[in-house]
């Protein structure tokens, strides 16, 4: 049947080429037109495969070269040619070979006064122009001159023809040769005048497509330097800026506004950042480097988070690059367990693992070790709280005992917190779903006293004490809160304030924090503490939804940037804060906000007031680096209440951000904390993230083209006058906070049951101890059997915070630590059957000094795992050494997991390692024997997908990339043979699936994920074939047997959203407004031929209609365009 259809079509085409009878030719064209006007494009592609393009082109040439071309034939023929040519990739080459290009141009020139004939010629020229080869020939043969004759002078007659001419011209101007020709011939002025004619006279916005077509021509022209110069000389910036103001609020003008904005962005002169140098304001004389040395040979991978595919994936080219990065060398993919350290060096790790060799007496806590005093007793808890209960406790004005509250729920295990399904909500989380939160709370999360009680009793002593707000909000590390009116009382001010406004926060003690902060060493010697870190944080009473982005917010910000260029006198441009200035600037500056960032984890380098309530901010690069500007954390004070302040962070590096997809920065108000609501909350409106006009100095990049920067802009309305507020990229978690947390944990546990050991893995380059925590259960007795079971427990290794800016990893780790020492039956089982070795912060120096990614040497420590050196990367060297030591004793970890944060995707997910999946993805064909591997690496992610509300299997990946060869995940997998070696990524933003869909992550959700990870480890063990009957029996006795069986079966069922290979899905749709402004953007309307198809179809249905349109109004002078 198919052969008959093919032969029938070929017969039609053959007859068409050889027929000299007009009626027969018209009949065949009618049949072909009817065939191609219905159904799918498959019919057109089938016709192309049977020589349809050649037949139509040959018919065109034969008809056009006759003494009197018959337009009754040419019109339907042109329509068919345009329709077929859009789908034929070789259409241009075929047209050149058959000389159809020349005859089409000749016909167009002869029909300038016949709009219907000319319109059809232009449609086919539009198809020719989309081909590089035929487009070049059109330019050589004078097509642009022909088009300008059609476009000028301005007229409202034949508007469909004018529209078609603009589209052909826009397609031609994608060629650099045509661009230069257009600039040299003065067409820039002509196009500007034409656009202004249409803009000023099209008052009803009837001809938006023509105006858009002219703007596309200009957009291509300004992509060329000479084109931009001509455009600027013709006052193009001022002209288009003025025209944009008149139509911003008109939704029907979206095409025009978007094109204008892109042209203005393209023409904004590139400039250097307002910094003395791109290098960090902080330096450190690290071994092997000098303070002025910058990292060389930077690659795109240096800007990626571990496992992050941070770059946009909008094209097939990016996909090809990703596939090229896949490791295909079997020798590098194969696991090769072995030691790269001498055995004598491994002996140093004996002291870090006393549980393997010490006697029972040596392990027992000494009499003085029981530190459960009245200050920390209530910090002990019996199981990790759900997000809702944690919030409820933190904002409970009755200050009920934490211990008592936990005792009330001791019989309720973490199992009650797991998600009930992809669309379900955990029972403990129902109350915290996005409820009807007060509008002001949604915006700032601050104005409402969550307890519902009157706050006057707290506010009164605050006012009576008349504290110096600046001193309170950023106290000196000496624990002094100076009071300007009563200096003699300054020494006891801190104690007095803490006593007056005491509010218990679980696992936090300001007194201990001060002590730890005094011991912390920074590169520049910080002398102040951030108030939120001292005072503490409680999750807000309700989950905060993602911010709905308003359409047009980005273009408004960009137009404000353009306004600065065009009207510089309107800009204040006053530096109000700078780390580069030898003396503080703000003492003599008034009528502006005051900024501060010289505290632990703080990052703000410079603040410039540009308008009364608007500031440009620049964040500091990592120490000894000129890169990695993302993390920010600073104090701002001196504000007015109920006034929107706009902040523009102008030196961001990432090409996209979750700030474009609902994420908000975090804010902590000192006054709110003193009023009993100490919380980091998501805040900000009018948020967007886009490429700006700043460029890094090429000299900084070793002569390479200077890197472009991005702007994060947001508005904050502060709740109180003269408050002091802290703003941060994400919820901060400092090194001193960690050390305080570990100390409180150690004090709060029952040392008769829980073996908790806090060691020092090593000293960092900055002189700070890197903590190593061991958690397990004490042996039941000192009998040989119990001691043997104790020493034979398998190990679980968890690390975090190798990248300082990923503070969410620390909050997940906090949840893990608190759960493991809790009285939850699951935690008890885990302690009895595993030894947990935890390094909660692999990069203390980076965290302390406000880095985003690097160590004090300016290098990414997660790219140093292949061959770390003790004097250069001590924490990585000893972490790897400890892992090698465990492997050498036959105690390699069951699971290794490195906690990270992810800035481009939502949810929580794992990256693992699979040789088979990597080779499959890369398209490599190898023998079956080479593909044999342990597939258990998929089990834990599948379990977490069933249990953890924030986790999704869909985003997990198990590919091994060349660029990740030196990361912890890959090195532990390859060198130590740990098949379950993972990176766990937590979004900075929130969830787009499951119970938390549409909500931003708070610290409660992150801590909950840390606890859920532990539950996943237990389920993994219970499901394993080697699970002992004793453990199963113990689990049944501690947990509800029916409930346990339910979850074991549930985690054994196949995941509905996973298969043999889980494909990674795009996390976000295209942004509503273009982040970039490249001239060849795929969103250009001329790239989409659907509209041209529609025009052709419409013309075919109304071919008897006259297209002539009368000019509206009289007396308009037609302006000639030259």
UniProtKB/Swiss-Prot annotation:
GO terms for biological process: C-terminal protein deglutamylation; protein side chain deglutamylation; proteolysis. Gene3D superfamilies: 2.60.40.3120, Leucine-rich Repeat Variant, Zn peptidases. Binds 1 zinc ion per subunit. Residues 287-338, 1099-1122 are annotated as: Disordered. Its EC number is 3.4.17.-, 3.4.17.24. Widely expressed at low level. Expressed in eye, muscle, pituitary, testis and to a lower extent in brain. The active site is at residue 985. PROSITE patterns: PEPTIDASE_M14. Zn(2+) binds at residues 803, 806, 900. It catalyses: (L-glutamyl)(n+1)-gamma-L-glutamyl-L-glutamyl-[protein] + H2O = (L-glutamyl)(n)-gamma-L-glutamyl-L-glutamyl-[protein] + L-glutamate; C-terminal L-alpha-aminoacyl-L-glutamyl-L-glutamyl-[tubulin] + H2O = C-terminal L-alpha-aminoacyl-L-glutamyl-[tubulin] + L-glutamate. Interacts with MYLK. Interacts with TCF4. This is Cytosolic carboxypeptidase 4. The gene is Agbl1.
């Amino acid at each position: 049947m198919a052969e008959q259809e093919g032969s029938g079509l070929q017969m039609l085409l053959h007859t068409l080429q050889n027929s000299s009878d007009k009626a027969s030719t018209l009949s065949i064209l009618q049949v072909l037109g009817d065939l191609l006007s219905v159904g799918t494009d498959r019919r057109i592609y089938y016709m192309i495969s049977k020589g349809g393009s050649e037949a139509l082109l040959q018919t065109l040439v034969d008809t056009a070269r006759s003494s009197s071309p018959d337009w009754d034939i040419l019109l339907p023929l042109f329509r068919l040619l345009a329709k077929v040519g859009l789908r034929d990739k070789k259409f241009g080459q075929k047209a050149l070979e058959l000389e159809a290009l020349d005859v089409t141009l000749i016909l167009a020139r002869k029909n300038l006064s016949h709009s219907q004939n000319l319109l059809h010629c232009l449609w086919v020229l539009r198809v020719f122009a989309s081909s590089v080869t035929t487009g070049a020939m059109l330019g050589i043969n004078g097509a642009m001159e022909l088009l300008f004759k059609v476009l000028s002078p301005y007229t409202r007659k034949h508007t469909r023809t004018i529209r078609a001419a603009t589209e052909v011209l826009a397609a031609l101007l994608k060629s650099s040769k045509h661009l230069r020709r257009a600039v040299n011939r003065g067409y820039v002025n002509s196009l500007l005048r034409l656009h202004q004619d249409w803009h000023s006279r099209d008052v009803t916005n009837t001809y938006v497509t023509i105006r858009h077509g002219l703007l596309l021509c200009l957009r291509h022209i300004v992509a060329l330097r000479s084109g931009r110069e001509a455009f600027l000389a013709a006052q193009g910036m001022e002209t288009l800026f003025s025209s944009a103001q008149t139509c911003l609020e008109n939704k029907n003008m979206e095409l025009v506004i978007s094109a204008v904005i892109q042209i203005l962005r393209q023409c904004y002169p590139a400039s250097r950042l307002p910094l003395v140098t791109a290098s960090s304001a902080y330096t450190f004389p690290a071994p092997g480097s000098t303070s002025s040395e910058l990292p060389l040979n930077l690659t795109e991978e240096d800007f990626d988070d571990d496992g992050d595919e941070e770059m946009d994936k909008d094209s097939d080219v990016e996909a090809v690059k990703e596939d090229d990065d896949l490791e295909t060398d079997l020798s590098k993919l194969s696991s090769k367990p072995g030691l790269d350290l001498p055995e004598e060096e491994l002996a140093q790790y004996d002291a870090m693992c006393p549980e393997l060799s010490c006697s029972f007496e040596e392990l027992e806590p000494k009499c003085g070790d029981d530190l459960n005093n009245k200050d920390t007793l209530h910090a002990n808890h019996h199981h990790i709280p759900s997000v809702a209960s944690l919030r409820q406790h933190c904002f409970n004005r009755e200050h009920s005992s934490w211990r008592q509250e936990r005792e009330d729920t001791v019989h309720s295990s973490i199992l009650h917190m797991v998600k009930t399904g992809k669309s379900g909500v955990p029972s403990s989380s129902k109350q915290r779903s996005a409820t009807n939160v007060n509008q002001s709370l949604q915006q700032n999360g601050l104005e409402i006293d969550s307890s519902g009680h009157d706050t006057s009793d707290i506010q009164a002593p605050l006012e009576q004490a008349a504290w110096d707000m600046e001193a309170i909000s950023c106290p000196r590390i000496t624990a002094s809160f100076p009071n300007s009116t009563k200096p003699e009382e300054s020494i006891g001010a801190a104690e007095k304030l803490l006593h007056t406004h005491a509010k218990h926060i679980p696992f936090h003690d300001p007194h201990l924090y001060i002590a730890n902060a005094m011991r912390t060493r920074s590169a520049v010697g910080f002398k102040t503490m951030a108030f939120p870190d001292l005072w503490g944080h409680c999750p807000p009473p309700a989950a905060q939804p993602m911010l709905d982005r308003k359409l047009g917010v980005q273009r408004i910000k960009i137009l404000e940037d353009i306004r600065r260029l065009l009207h510089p006198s309107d800009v204040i441009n006053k530096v109000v804060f700078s780390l580069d200035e030898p003396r503080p600037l703000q003492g003599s500056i008034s009528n502006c906000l005051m900024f501060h960032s010289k505290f632990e984890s703080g990052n703000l380098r410079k603040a410039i007031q540009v308008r009364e309530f608007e500031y440009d901010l620049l964040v500091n690069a990592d120490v000894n680096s000129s890169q990695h500007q993302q993390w920010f954390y600073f104090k701002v004070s001196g504000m007015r209440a109920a006034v929107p302040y706009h902040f523009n962070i102008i030196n961001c590096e990432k090409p996209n951000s979750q700030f474009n997809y609902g994420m908000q920065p975090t804010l902590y108000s000192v006054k709110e904390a003193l009023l009993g609501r100490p919380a980091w909350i998501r805040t900000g409106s009018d948020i967007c993230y886009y490429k700006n006009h700043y460029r890094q100095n090429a000299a900084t990049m070793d002569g390479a083209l200077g890197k472009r920067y991005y702007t994060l802009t947001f508005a904050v309305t502060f709740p109180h006058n003269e408050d002091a507020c802290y703003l941060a990229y994400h919820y901060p978690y400092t090194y001193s906070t960690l050390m305080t947390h570990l100390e409180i944990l150690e004090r709060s546990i029952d040392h008769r049951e829980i073996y908790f050991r806090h060691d020092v893995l090593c000293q960092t380059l900055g002189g700070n101890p890197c903590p190593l925590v061991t958690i397990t259960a004490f042996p039941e007795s000192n009998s040989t059997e119990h001691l043997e079971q104790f020493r034979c427990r398998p190990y679980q290794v968890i690390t975090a915070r190798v990248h300082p800016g990923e503070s969410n990893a620390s909050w997940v780790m906090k949840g893990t630590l608190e759960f493991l020492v809790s009285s939850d039956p699951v935690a008890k089982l885990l302690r009895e059957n595993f030894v947990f070795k935890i390094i909660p912060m692999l990069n203390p120096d980076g965290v302390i000094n406000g880095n985003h990614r690097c160590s004090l040497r300016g290098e990414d420590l997660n790219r140093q795992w292949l061959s770390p050196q003790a004097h250069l990367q001590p924490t990585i060297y000893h972490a790897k050494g400890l892992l090698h030591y465990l492997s050498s004793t036959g105690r390699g970890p069951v699971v290794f997991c490195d906690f990270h944060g992810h800035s481009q995707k939502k949810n929580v997910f794992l990256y693992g390692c699979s040789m088979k999946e990597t080779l499959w993805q890369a398209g490599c064909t190898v023998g079956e024997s080479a593909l044999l591997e342990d597939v258990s690496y998929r089990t834990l992610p599948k379990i977490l997908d069933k249990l953890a509300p924030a986790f999704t299997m869909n985003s997990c990946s198990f590919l091994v990339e060349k660029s990740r060869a030196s990361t912890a995940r890959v090195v532990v997998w390859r060198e130590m043979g740990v098949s379950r070696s993972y990176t766990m990524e937590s979004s900075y933003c929130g969830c787009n699936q499951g119970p938390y869909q549409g909500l931003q992550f708070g610290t409660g959700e992150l801590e909950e994920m840390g606890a859920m990870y532990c539950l996943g480890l237990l389920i993994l063990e219970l499901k394993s074939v080697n699970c002992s009957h004793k453990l199963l029996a113990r689990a049944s006795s501690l947990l509800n047997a029916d409930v346990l069986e339910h979850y074991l079966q549930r985690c054994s069922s196949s995941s509905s959203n996973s298969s043999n290979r889980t494909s990674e899905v795009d996390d976000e749709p295209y942004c509503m407004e273009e982040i970039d402004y490249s001239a060849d953007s795929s969103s250009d309307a001329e790239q989409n031929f659907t509209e041209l198809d529609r025009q052709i179809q419409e013309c075919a249905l109304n071919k008897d209609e006259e297209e002539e349109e009368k000019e509206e109004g009289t007396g308009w002078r037609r302006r000639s365009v030259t």
